[in-house]
Amino acid sequence: MRCCYCGHGESKVLETRSAEEGRVIRRRRECMECNRRFTTLERIEETPLIVRKKGGSLEAFDRNKLLSGLLKACEKRPIPLDRLEELVTTVERDLRSQYDREVPSREIGEMLMARLRNIDEVAYVRFASVYRQFTDVGRFLEELEGLLKRKT
């Protein structure tokens, strides 16, 4: 590994650790020329997921877009940010295990809603109202009735 300080091509590994749930290897190195220490990260190069939108267009999967939608749905709700980040990570992992490359946007929305329903029902209804594009109160009430039936 080339030294980031002097550019020398040889370094020795002082320490190796697993990070990010085993998806990253962190190595502490020392340059054989200038003796300065630096850190490198080694991670799997994942194939990017492509989302097929309802209208047929394609766009790159963006976990920040999912998190943003969840944050709006969970506004003023007692849900920690790390819980939402964990939810997005779980959904992304499940998508990667079920799809090679192209994912229907419908599947992403359904996965998020199924998990959000178990975390916070108010946030779930907010998310569902946007995702399912409720156009009238009747459709909204149907969703609420479905939630109430699950509780009994």
From Swiss-Prot:
Cofactor(s) recorded in Swiss-Prot or TrEMBL: Zn(2+)
A GO MF term: zinc ion binding
Zinc finger (unnamed): 3-34
PROSITE patterns: ATP_CONE
Top-level taxon in the UniProt lineage: Bacteria
Keywords of this entry: ATP-binding, DNA-binding, Metal-binding, Nucleotide-binding, Repressor, Transcription, Transcription regulation, Zinc, Zinc-finger
Binding note for cofactor: Binds 1 zinc ion.
Family to which this protein belongs: Belongs to the NrdR family.
Job of this protein: Negatively regulates transcription of bacterial ribonucleotide reductase nrd genes and operons by binding to NrdR-boxes.
Protein name per its UniProtKB record: Transcriptional repressor NrdR
Gene: nrdR
